[in-house]
Amino acid sequence: MAAEDPPVSGVSGRYATALFELARDEKSVDAVKADLDKFNALLDESADLKRLVRSPVFGADVQLKALNAVLDKAGIAGVAANVLRVLTANRRLFAVADVIRAFNALVAKYKGEATADVTVAEPLSDKNLDALKASLKTVTGKDVALNVKVDPAIIGGLVVKLGSRMIDSSLRTKLNSIKHAMKEAG
C-alpha cells in the first residue's frame, strides 16, 4: 500500500513508512499509533522534553538515556519505543513530530479515513469532538481522524484544515476582519 502511492515524503516519510509497514506486518498498527500519540502528547506538555528532542547540543547517548527514562515512565514499549530509539541513534530525533504526523497519515489512509488538523482555543469535550467528526464525515464521506491542537491565541472558535481545505471560524480572524473593515471605512 505505502509503496504504491506514498502520502508522505522526506526523511520523516521514510521512517514513517518503514514503521507503518512493520506495525502492519505485526498487526499492531493501533497499538503503535496509541504509543506514538502518547509520546507526542508528552512532547507537547514538556518544554524540557521538547528541548531534548530538538537541540543538537545533546549527544545521542544523553538523548537515549533520557528517552529510555521517558519511555519507561510512560509505558511505551515495543515497535513504537524501538523506532524512537532508532531515531535517537541515527541523530534524527528532531524529526519525531513529523514522523508521527506522517505515520498517522499512513494509518488514516490505510483505514480509509481522512485526517483533519483542528486548532482550538481550549480543549473540546468528547461531545464536541464527536459532533465535529460527524460534521466532517458528512462533508468528506469518510471517517475523520482529528489532530487537535490547543492554541489560546485564536481566542475562540476553531480552525479546521482538511486536505487542501481550510475553515477558519476563529474569533481572532473575525476580529481582524472587523479591524480591516474599520480601517478601510475610516
Swiss-Prot record:
Q: Please tell me whether the keyword ATP-binding is annotated for this protein.
A: no
A matching Pfam family: OSCP
Q: What domain of life does the UniProt record list for this protein's source?
A: Bacteria
**Molecular function terms in GO for this entry?**
proton-transporting ATP synthase activity, rotational mechanism
| Membrane topology, record value | Peripheral membrane protein
The entry's localization annotation reads: Cell inner membrane
Q: Name the major location.
A: membrane
Job description of the protein: F(1)F(0) ATP synthase produces ATP from ADP in the presence of a proton or sodium gradient. F-type ATPases consist of two structural domains, F(1) containing the extramembraneous catalytic core and F(0) containing the membrane proton channel, linked together by a central stalk and a peripheral stalk. During catalysis, ATP synthesis in the catalytic domain of F(1) is coupled via a rotary mechanism of the central stalk subunits to proton translocation. This protein is part of the stalk that links CF(0) to CF(1). It either transmits conformational changes from CF(0) to CF(1) or is implicated in proton conduction.
Q: How does it assemble?
A: F-type ATPases have 2 components, F(1) - the catalytic core - and F(0) - the membrane proton channel. F(1) has five subunits: alpha(3), beta(3), gamma(1), delta(1), epsilon(1). CF(0) has four main subunits: a(1), b(1), b'(1) and c(10-14). The alpha and beta chains form an alternating ring which encloses part of the gamma chain. F(1) is attached to F(0) by a central stalk formed by the gamma and epsilon chains, while a peripheral stalk is formed by the delta, b and b' chains.
**Protein family membership:** Belongs to the ATPase delta chain family.
Q: What is this protein called?
A: ATP synthase subunit delta
